[in-house]
């Protein structure tokens, strides 16, 4: 119990307490291993215009994220981030951001994001998962579930191997990339809210988020990957509508440098 309490941390974006039993450096090593293995087999899109769109929006979201953390004295949270933006030739409606800022977008989701604003909804959301250390939190929860509190201390003494093994499960980078251990409702709410903040600070219109998630919900069986681990459509859209008025203060013209 003392070990678990000592490992409690606070989400830098929202102040929520979270349990982190895996160090940032260890998580980064494990996630980069999974990412590099995936990118060796993934087929990058040959569509120059679409690729440029992903890079363009991704860079603006990344810059806004960095600015938000700088303004709030949390620059250290991104010290190991090296942003990369990839568009993969795959018809799935999916995207993800690995720890360290490795962003992957599937061509399929561009069908649902016709404008840069729409794509910013997706990328803002996924970046939050990485910055808020949601993957670390899931891995920590799995360590507790796998080993139990009684032998957790002994397990952690050998957790390099355990971390690599859990990374394969948590990140799920393979034929079903993105179908990972589901983020909790808390994680999704954080990603939805802070994703809106980041995209707004980047100069995008957060109001399009409602339309994007409505299109996702109308996709039915064709979009199970992203929706399967997220809250119900009605719950998400209702929450986003509640968040939108607050986004006004994050618009670039309203922020003080």
PLM features per residue range, with description:
Residues 1-8:
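Sec-dependent bacterial lipoprotein signal peptides
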Residues 8-257:
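A Zn2+-metalloprotease active-site environment signal
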């Amino acid at each position: 119990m003392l070990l678990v309490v000592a490992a409690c941390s606070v989400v830098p974006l929202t102040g929520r307490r979270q349990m982190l039993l895996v160090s940032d450096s260890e998580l980064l090593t494990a996630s980069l291993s999974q990412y590099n293995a995936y990118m060796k087999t993934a087929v990058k899109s040959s569509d120059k215009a679409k690729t440029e769109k992903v890079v363009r929006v991704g860079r603006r979201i990344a810059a806004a994220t960095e600015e938000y953390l700088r303004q709030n004295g949390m620059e250290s949270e991104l010290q190991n981030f090296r942003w990369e933006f990839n568009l993969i030739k795959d018809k799935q409606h999916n995207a993800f951001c690995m720890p360290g800022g490795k962003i992957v977008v599937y061509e399929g989701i561009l069908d649902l994001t016709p404008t840069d604003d729409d794509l910013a909804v997706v990328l803002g959301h996924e970046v939050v998962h990485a910055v808020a250390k949601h993957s670390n939190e899931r891995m920590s929860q799995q360590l507790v579930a796998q080993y139990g509190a009684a032998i957790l201390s002994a397990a952690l003494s050998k957790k390099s191997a355990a971390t690599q093994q859990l990374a394969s499960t948590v990140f799920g980078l393979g034929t079903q990339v993105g179908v990972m251990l589901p983020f909790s409702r808390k994680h999704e709410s954080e990603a939805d809210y802070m994703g809106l903040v980041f995209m707004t600070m980047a100069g995008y219109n957060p109001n399009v988020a409602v339309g994007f998630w409505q299109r996702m919900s109308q996709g039915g069986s064709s979009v199970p990957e992203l929706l399967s681990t997220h809250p119900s459509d009605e719950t998400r859209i209702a929450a986003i509508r509640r968040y939108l008025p607050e986004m006004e203060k994050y618009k670039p013209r309203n922020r003080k440098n």
